[in-house]
Amino acid sequence: MYLNKEIDEVIHTLRNTNELKEISFLKAFPYVTKPTRLSKRCAVLSPNSLELESVSVDNTDFYGTGEIRIDLFCPYHLGSPVIFDDMQKIVKASLNDEISKISISAISVDSSCECYVLTAVLGFGYYEKTEDL
């Protein structure tokens, strides 16, 4: 999965933030759907997009933008205001010098999991240097 390193860094930061100890942070696995009723809050991180352009004559330097998606799930019994407070804490803890864009969706409901869902997207500049084979 692309953006593995970046997602791992964000997960590490979030797991080590005291305000977020009651939330489980997971890396998404593509093509796996296992709806289940949630009993606690859960945040799932996954790549959202990656756009690169060659910025060198020899096509070894690429620069562009990447985005990491954070889906926060909060059980109905905790109430919808909790999900907004938790997402605010997650975004605040994720901020660093590389983040250049933040967007947060409207709240939605997932009846199969009996939870509220709120999505944030963190955008950043991305540089990749490849060596000729």
Which sequence ranges carry the predicted segments?
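Small/polar-rich, solvent-exposed N-terminal microdomains that initiate assembly or binding
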Residues: 1-56, 78-85
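Short, charged interaction patches at domain edges and termini
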Residues: 1-13, 36, 50-63, 99-133
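Structural alpha-beta junctions
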Residues: 20-22, 95-101
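Generic recognition of cysteine residues
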Residues: 42, 74, 113-115
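A broad, low-specificity signal marking well-ordered, structured residues that form hydrophobic/aromatic
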Residues: 42-43, 68, 120
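Active-site-adjacent structural patch at catalytic or cofactor/ligand-binding sites
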Residues: 48-49, 63-74
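Short beta-strand-to-loop capping motifs
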Residues: 72-76, 124-126
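Short, hydrophobic/π-rich interface segment
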Residues: 77-97
